């Protein structure tokens, strides 16, 4: 889909507490490694039949924010249609407060910057 896997992995580290799922709104059994569908406290978010489908949905959702290009594979992201396509072409704009379009993946301030800090730390290992 043209989305960087390292960015998706860093996002998954953020959303799952480095895959411990401590403090995460999602559980391992959901195969949801990005908090997809968690729109407020207490909401468990989307579930996927396999880890592969969960990761594909995450990549597709990131593409929805980053681009207006068509998907290359069948859509498995139930929330794809809710995204204003191309509204966050930069990782830094994934947080709604930082996005000049007022849109984004997460409402928390600095969301995209947190993803990039995790990625930087991984690359420095």
Predicted regions and their residues:
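Catalytic cores of secreted/periplasmic lytic hydrolases that degrade extracellular macromolecules
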Residues: 1-125
């Amino acid at each position: 889909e043209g989305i960087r896997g390292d960015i998706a992995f860093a996002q998954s580290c953020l959303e799952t507490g480095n895959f411990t799922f401590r403090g995460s709104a999602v559980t391992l059994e959901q195969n949801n490694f990005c908090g997809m569908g968690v729109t407020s406290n207490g909401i468990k978010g989307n579930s996927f039949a396999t880890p592969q489908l969960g990761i594909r949905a995450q990549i597709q959702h990131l593409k929805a924010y980053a681009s207006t290009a068509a998907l290359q594979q069948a859509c498995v992201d139930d929330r794809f249609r809710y995204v204003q396509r191309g509204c966050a072409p930069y990782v830094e704009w994934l947080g709604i407060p930082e996005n000049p379009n007022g849109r984004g993946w997460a409402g928390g301030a600095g969301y995209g910057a947190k993803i990039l800090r995790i990625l930087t730390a991984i690359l420095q290992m």
